[in-house]
Every structure is written in C-alpha cells, then in structure tokens.
Amino acid sequence: MAREECKALLDGLNKTTACYHHLVLTVGGSADSQNLRQELQKTRQKAQELAVSTCARLTAVLRDRGLAADERAEFERLWVAFSGCLDLLEADMRRALELGAAFPLHAPRRPLVRTGVAGASSGVAARALSTRSLRLEAEGDFDVADLRELEREVLQVGEMIDNMEMKVNVPRWTVQARQAAGAELLSTVSAGPSSVVSLQERGGGCDPRKALAAILFGAVLLAAVALAVCVAKLS
C-alpha cells in the first residue's frame, strides 16, 4: 500500500515538474504574459506540495528499521528518482527566477525575446505599447511579488534537499536499476503490438545469410567494374 502511494505521488510530481519545465522555457519569449507567470506560480506550488508529501512518505518508510531488504531496495529506487526530480525542479525554479528578473512584465521598455513575430515595426510597436500601458499597473504588483515569493521558494526547496540527505542516507551509486536501459521502449503500455514487433526487428542481430549475400554482391560488382575498365583500355 505504501509503495503504490509513493509511486502515485512520484508520478504526479514527475508530470508536474515536466509541465513546469516547458512553461519556464517560454519566459521572455513572445508568448510571455501575466497569464503565463500565473500558470508558472500555480504549477510550481503544486509541484512543491507533491514534493513535501512524497518526501514525508518516503522518509517515514525508509527510516523504518523493520523494513524487509527487497522492500527497502524498491523504496530506495523511488527515493533516488524523487531526489533527481527535486534537483530538476530547483534548477528550473532558479532559471525562472533569472528569466523573470531579466524580462520583467512591469518594465515595458525592456523588450522581450523576439521569436518570429513579423510586421511593420511602427505599427507593431504602437499596438504593443498601447496594450502594455493598459495592463501595466495590474501586472506590476504581481510580477514583483511573484519574484520575491519565487526567491523564497527556491531557498525552501534547497533546504528540503539538504534535510533529505541528513534524514535518509541513500547514495545514488548504490541503487541498481531493475530493468536494462531502454527497456521501457518495449513496454506494451507505451507502445502497441506493431511497434513492439518493429522495435524487436530493428534491435535484432545481423542475419549471416544477408551479410554473405551482400559480400558476394559486392565482389561481383567490383569484378564487373574491373572488367569494364580493362575492355575500355583495350579498345
């Protein structure tokens, strides 16, 4: 029961962190807006809530001295996956903080990154400035407050990582994977039967008969070329 609960929490954290990563990549671009910043705020807060719940659940289980060896190995794998996910979340939050400070919404004089928007410069600039001025006051307070809150949350995530390492000592290099690299590509959950067959065919070894036929064909081709050169010289 505890294992399934931890897996569900970790799966939700992975999806939320991936969503946050894609949103961070658009900060400072032509799609940047107050709606994007608000969505970033909601997503990172959801990720932190899931991280706190996952950390508390895994910590309680791994600190149980009566845990069986096979169960402990499974929870240690979940712990390593959770630790890596938290590292990625912290890195994306720091990136969002840097980009948010470099491209503030409350300072329209600082142009955003151009990502393919085209048109007459005077008309585009006039429309952009008029639209910006209408929302300047509404966006200014949110932008500044969100950056301050994000800075505090980055420190909190860093403290969470430090506390994790102090409470539970699970070196990443001691945890062994249960599946070989790329084994998920053959899973019937993520791929249909036809995809599995094609992957198996492409992943199989070289057929000796085909290799021999290719060698013979190459030899015949070289002989034909040599014969053609000789005939050309004699003529």
Swiss-Prot record:
Transmembrane listed as a keyword = yes
Kindly list the biological process annotations in GO that this record carries.
detection of light stimulus involved in visual perception; G protein-coupled receptor signaling pathway; negative regulation of signal transduction
The superkingdom listed in its UniProt entry is Eukaryota
Q: Which GO terms describe its cellular component?
A: membrane; neuron projection; rod photoreceptor outer segment
Q: Which residues cross the membrane?
A: 211-231
Q: Tell whether Iron-sulfur is among the UniProt keywords.
A: no
What membrane topology term does the record carry?
Single-pass type IV membrane protein
Q: Spell out the residue ranges making up region: SNARE-like.
A: 153-200
Task: Write down the InterPro entries for this protein, in alphabetical order.
Answer: RGS7BP/RGS9BP
- Where in or outside the cell is it found? Membrane
The stretches that face the Cytoplasmic side, renumbered to this chain, are 1-210
Q: Which disorder is it associated with? A: Prolonged electroretinal response suppression 2: A form of bradyopsia, an ocular disorder characterized by prolonged electroretinal response suppression leading to difficulties adjusting to changes in luminance, normal to subnormal acuity and photophobia. PERRS2 is an autosomal recessive form with onset in childhood.
Q: Which family does it belong to?
A: Belongs to the RGS7BP/RGS9BP family.
The protein's job, in short, is: Regulator of G protein-coupled receptor (GPCR) signaling in phototransduction. Participates in the recovery phase of visual transduction via its interaction with RGS9-1 isoform. Acts as a membrane-anchor that mediates the targeting of RGS9-1 to the photoreceptor outer segment, where phototransduction takes place. Enhances the ability of RGS9-1 to stimulate G protein GTPase activity, allowing the visual signal to be terminated on the physiologically time scale. It also controls the proteolytic stability of RGS9-1, probably by protecting it from degradation.
How it assembles, according to the record, is:
Specifically interacts with isoform RGS9-1 of RGS9. Component of the RGS9-1-Gbeta5 complex composed of RGS9-1, Gbeta5 (GNB5) and RGS9BP.
Identification of the protein by name: Regulator of G-protein signaling 9-binding protein
From the broadest rank down, the organism's phylogenetic lineage runs:
Eukaryota, Metazoa, Chordata, Craniata, Vertebrata
